[in-house]
């Protein structure tokens, strides 16, 4: 089943004013998602340039919401304790190009 994941940064200006440590964390975040992309669980992910504050979006494919939540909670940004938040919502219907 597909799930929608939305990653919220600790502040609206995060993309513009990341510290060097936060940049390294975001590299770990991207590597984590790319690893799961290679495993076939990540369908797509990326940055949304919302003028109110950029956020991350991902579509993932897992057997259960618990598995999707476990994946999201394993993201280095969430484990960092720096104030990132993630929403995981089921997508009971969807259409994929292909």
Language model: regions and residue ranges:
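Conserved, structured core segments of small domains
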Residues: 1-98
């Amino acid at each position: 089943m597909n799930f929608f994941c939305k990653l919220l940064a600790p502040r609206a200006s995060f993309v513009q004013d990341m510290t060097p440590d936060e940049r390294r964390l975001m590299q770990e975040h991207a590597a984590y998602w790319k690893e799961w992309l290679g495993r076939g669980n990540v369908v797509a992910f990326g940055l949304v340039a919302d003028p109110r504050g950029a956020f991350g979006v991902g579509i993932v494919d897992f057997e259960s919401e618990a598995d999707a939540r476990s994946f999201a909670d394993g993201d280095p940004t969430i484990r960092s304790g720096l104030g990132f938040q993630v929403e995981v919502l089921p997508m009971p219907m969807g259409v994929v190009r292909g």
